[in-house]
Every structure is written in structure tokens, then in C-alpha cells.
Amino acid sequence: MSKIIIRGARILGGEPGDVLIDGETIAEVGTGLDADGATVIEAEGQILLPGLVDLHTHLREPGREDSETVLTGTKAAAVGGFTAVHAMANTFPVADTAGVVEQVWRLGKESGYCDVQPVGAVTVGLEGRKLAELGAMHDSAAGVKVFSDDGKCVDDAVIMRRALEYVKAFDGVVAQHAQEPRLTEGAQMNEGIVSAELGLGGWPAVAEESIIARDVLLAAHVGSRVHICHLSTAGSVEIVRWAKSKGWNVTAEVTPHHLLLTDELVRTYNPVYKVNPPLRTEADVLALREALADGTIDCVATDHAPHPHEDKDCEWAAAAMGMVGLETALSVVQQTMVDTGLIDWAGVADRMSFRPAAIGRLDGHGRPVSAGEPANLTLVDPAYRGAVDPAGFASRSRNTPYEGRELPGRVTHTFLRGRATVVDGKLA
């Protein structure tokens, strides 16, 4: 088995140290480490993190391989420092049966760039009327633990209650896309001053907040776990904070783009900024950052949503919603959270590895950088500065809102169970 020494890295941003990888496992952590025949990576000034975990990725396969495949999506994940991603269920066919989630799981095994944990649909066909085969998906080879109709809201309170009751039996979690559909009909962007000035249909904050309020109450009533996808408003933060103060089993995520971008960008009418939930106000952005820093929001999730060029190269109203995010997520978090002093690199490890792995009950990921642990690791150069060039993306799609924007930090190496998937910033 191969041996690798990562020398002089700041482990979780702390003091410099060495890590010896032997095969698939971290063999030793210390200083001045040596091993016969080991490959040495000089990592002075770099940050060593546990491999990143994404709770919210759209890999599009099966059905929309024109925008992404499991192979290209996991390549993008590795470049971004991720060693595990959760693949959302809004594929064609929908991942609402054991057969489809096992197909996605096997494609992930074959890709080899990161682990793929399928997310099962809550309802048949994402139609919100009948529970999908939750138990069968959990008992399948894919071992599904997270269920979501993401892209659509489980807006029927009875269906949501039944889903929460069902997954409680095996410690699963329902991840809710909080969007009251009757309040967002025809909506094109955040409802506010900018939407009024542009004459675009507004997407009110209460459409998100009302569903979150309902669902934290349902979760408390049932005694089950609920996870809120892509929190985007200050009001949503307050509801989650209140629910947590009650001791209820509620977790939440925020996307990198909601930590940085605002609805002012919609003035450009560039569809690259069209996303669900929409970009909100500066006040919302600041509230989300504070909530991620204080733990009200548990983790960062990319909501990586690739689209082919033609789905974005059109007028705003006709454009698809979504942004790619796997390859830029860590840089955006560094800019908005680390460089601003809101969290340190240990906080990044917590919000982008430990907590998402714990929420997804994902074995082997989100583990300490310690002897005996799986060698799922990410090495980051925080001093790097560079403009985002989507032409160099590993993802099949290019719909990034950051094209040409200078972002800090770069993943130099990613290790999946001791095997380098990224070396010097490039796929191995």
C-alpha cells in the first residue's frame, strides 16, 4: 500500500504538523514524521481539512446528462475539495424507488472521484400526493437516510407529517425545500424594492418562512428530524433559532451564493443570477452569515444545479433556475466567513464536513484528522487569489455567477480514502 506524508500543513488551521497516510487510513499525526518510500507533499502555509461533505448536490443523472453526469459532477466535487456528496432526487426518472437510488449509488462507486450518497424522494414523482418507497430506499444497497422533494416543496401538511413519522423509525431525515407554491406563482426574483423597480414578479420571504414554521412544529409534534434546505432569509433564521431554543431536532443549511450575492445583481438581467430560492437583500445575507457563525445554521451546502448553456442563454423569464457551485464553494466560504473573521478554519471543517456528515448519518466522512481515521482529506492554499474561469471547470455545465470574479483560496489536493483525486489543483 502507498504511503503519503503531508508535511507542515496547518491542521484545521492550527499549528503546523505532519500527517502520514498509509493505504486508506491516517496512520499518524505529529511533527517530523518519516516513512520509508513515502511520497512527501510539502504543505507549508496550507490548511488541512477533513474531506468536505455536501448535503445538497444535483448530479442530474439519470435523465439530464446534457447538464451533468455522476462522473462529471463527482470530478467537480473532488476539485472543490469534496469527498462525499448527496445526490438530489429530481432526476428522470425520479429517485423514488430502490432501483433508481441504487443506480445512482452504483454510478458513484464507478466514478471513483468521491462518494455519492443518493437522496430519496419524499413523494412519488415529486408530485406531493403519495409517499414514495421510503423504507425500501433505506433498506436498499444505497442505504438512503436523507429524503427530499427538493426543487419542489412538500406543501401538504399531512404528507409532511407522515413522512416525518415514517423516517423516524430508522433515524432518517426529511430535507424540506421550503416554498409555499401558492405564494410564489409567477415569481421571478425576491420580492422587494428591486423587484418593484424592475417590474418582475416577487418571491416573498414569507413563502419560505411559513413552511419552515409549519415544519419545525410538525417535527416537534412527531419527535422526528427535519432539515431545512437552502435557508435564504433573516426571518427563516429567526424561526430556526427559536426551534433550536426549544430543543427540537431541526437543522438547516445555507448555500455559498446566499452568503455573498444579493438581489441587486438581478438589475443586470443576467440569468446566471436566477436561482431558487432567489437572491435576497444585503440584510438577509448578513443575517445568514451571522447565523452560520453562531451555529443557528448548521452547515454550508452547495445546491450545485448545473444547466446546459441554452437553458441560461435566454431572457430572464424563460431561464432555468440554478447555479453550479461545487468548484467555488470553499472559496466563497473563505471570503465571506473566514476572511471576515466570523469563523476560523476549524469552523469551516465543522460547517462543511463534520456537521453535514452527521446530519446525513454518513459513515467514514466528517471524521477528525486523527490516527486510525479514514484518509478523506482536503488541502487548501488560503493565500491563493484568482479569477473564476468556468472554461476550466470539471463540471459539464458553466452556469456560475462568479465568472471573472476574484476569489480567495484553492484546493491543491483531495484524498479519498488515501488516494489522491486532485493533485496541484488538477484531477489526478
Short names for language-model regions:
Residues 55-68, 89-91, 117-130, 151, ...:
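Active-site mouth loops of central-metabolism enzymes
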Residues 197-225, 272, 293-294, 298-300, ...:
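His/Asp/Glu-enriched, well-ordered alpha-helical/loop segment
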Residues 315-318, 371-426:
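C-terminal cap of metal-dependent C-N hydrolases
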Residues 131-300:
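Histidine/acidic residue-rich metal-binding segments in metalloenzymes
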Residues 1-51:
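Histidine-rich, glycine-flanked metal-binding segment
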Residues 46-111:
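Metal-associated gating/positioning segment near the N- to mid-region
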Residues 9, 24, 45, 56, ...:
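Divalent metal-coordination and catalytic microenvironments
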Residues 106-122:
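A glycine-rich helix N-cap at a beta->alpha junction
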